[in-house]
Amino acid sequence: NIFNSIEVSKILHKFFNQKPKIIQSMYFEGNTATEEHQDSYFLDSENIGTLTAGWVALEEIKADAGRFFVIPKSHKLDIKKNQYYTNILSNHDKYIRELILESDLEKNSIRAPYLKKGDILFWNSLTIHGSLNSYSKTNSRSSITFHALPINHKFLHWHKHFIDTPYD
């Protein structure tokens, strides 16, 4: 079980300096592209930027299968609070494009590393990330993504709702 793995738990414990709790996981079987985004507006810790996610390769991810990518240093950009007048949630793609343009980051600065089966790429909720388009009819991108918080943190949803996440 990936989520109960001692190794994953130890890594998350090092990030948080306390025991982690996983609040969401998703299984991806297909090769659909995912636009670049920050997780923070959808889910985060009460301490914005603390949520840590992991992308687990369930097979060797070939370059033409549409690899997972991150934009290095994007977690250091000033985050804008979701407000009624900015409506970042409904216009997230526009917001990300503007954020990249306003910063020193270039869209071509993305990193889509080779990952073999069992490799995990970690990022925090402020890191801009996504999945590239697939150019293969035969290679897939089977993976699991999980999102974790420090065990005593509250789960913040849409930057406005706290959700109780009990643990044992």
Which ranges hold each PLM region?
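Short, conserved phosphate-binding/catalytic loop or strand-edge motifs used
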Residues: 28-32
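Double-stranded beta-helix
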Residues: 63-128
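Non-heme Fe(II)/2-oxoglutarate
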Residues: 1-4, 33-34, 80-85, 91, 117-122, 126-168
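Short, conserved beta-strand element in jelly-roll/cupin
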Residues: 44-63, 114-117, 122, 147-151
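Acidic, metal-coordinating catalytic segment for phosphate/diphosphate chemistry
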Residues: 38
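Signature of the catalytic double-stranded beta-helix
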Residues: 1-25, 47, 58
